[in-house]
């Protein structure tokens, strides 16, 4: 039983850690491409900024869904009978 709970804790940590790394890399790449596009065509900066912030929110939402799933794994009892 202790092994299963240990693996669940490890899995929850991996879900949160890898999700955070992926979200940070994605937002970083998106921000750099936004700056490149704004430098090339400054007249499109407002439209691009709106889309960038919308996508940043969606990327963060995907990470937070992963955190919720990890918390469900962490606090659920796999040995509970239905």
Curated annotation (Swiss-Prot):
Assigned keywords, A-Z: ATP synthesis, Cell inner membrane, Cell membrane, CF(0), Hydrogen ion transport, Ion transport, Lipid-binding, Membrane, Transmembrane, Transmembrane helix, Transport
Pfam families with a match to the protein in the record: ATP-synt_C
GO CC list: plasma membrane; proton-transporting ATP synthase complex; proton-transporting two-sector ATPase complex, proton-transporting domain
InterPro entries in UniProt: ATP_synth_csu_bac/chlpt, ATP_synth_F0_csu, ATP_synth_F0_csu_DDCD_BS, ATP_synth_F0_csu_sf, ATPase_proteolipid_c-like_dom, F/V-ATP_Csub_sf
Transmembrane segments annotated in the record for this chain: 7-27, 53-73
Membrane topology: Multi-pass membrane protein
UniProt KW Cell membrane keyword: yes
Compartment(s) where it occurs, according to its Swiss-Prot or TrEMBL record: Cell inner membrane
Main location: membrane
Superkingdom as given in the UniProt entry: Bacteria
GO molecular-function terms, A-Z: lipid binding; proton-transporting ATP synthase activity, rotational mechanism
Site (Reversibly protonated during proton transport) residue list: 60
Function: F(1)F(0) ATP synthase produces ATP from ADP in the presence of a proton or sodium gradient. F-type ATPases consist of two structural domains, F(1) containing the extramembraneous catalytic core and F(0) containing the membrane proton channel, linked together by a central stalk and a peripheral stalk. During catalysis, ATP synthesis in the catalytic domain of F(1) is coupled via a rotary mechanism of the central stalk subunits to proton translocation. Key component of the F(0) channel; it plays a direct role in translocation across the membrane. A homomeric c-ring of between 10-14 subunits forms the central stalk rotor element with the F(1) delta and epsilon subunits.
Complex formation: F-type ATPases have 2 components, F(1) - the catalytic core - and F(0) - the membrane proton channel. F(1) has five subunits: alpha(3), beta(3), gamma(1), delta(1), epsilon(1). F(0) has three main subunits: a(1), b(2) and c(10-14). The alpha and beta chains form an alternating ring which encloses part of the gamma chain. F(1) is attached to F(0) by a central stalk formed by the gamma and epsilon chains, while a peripheral stalk is formed by the delta and b chains.
Family in the record: Belongs to the ATPase C chain family.
Protein name: ATP synthase subunit c
Gene source species: Aromatoleum aromaticum (strain DSM 19018 / LMG 30748 / EbN1) (Azoarcus sp. (strain EbN1))
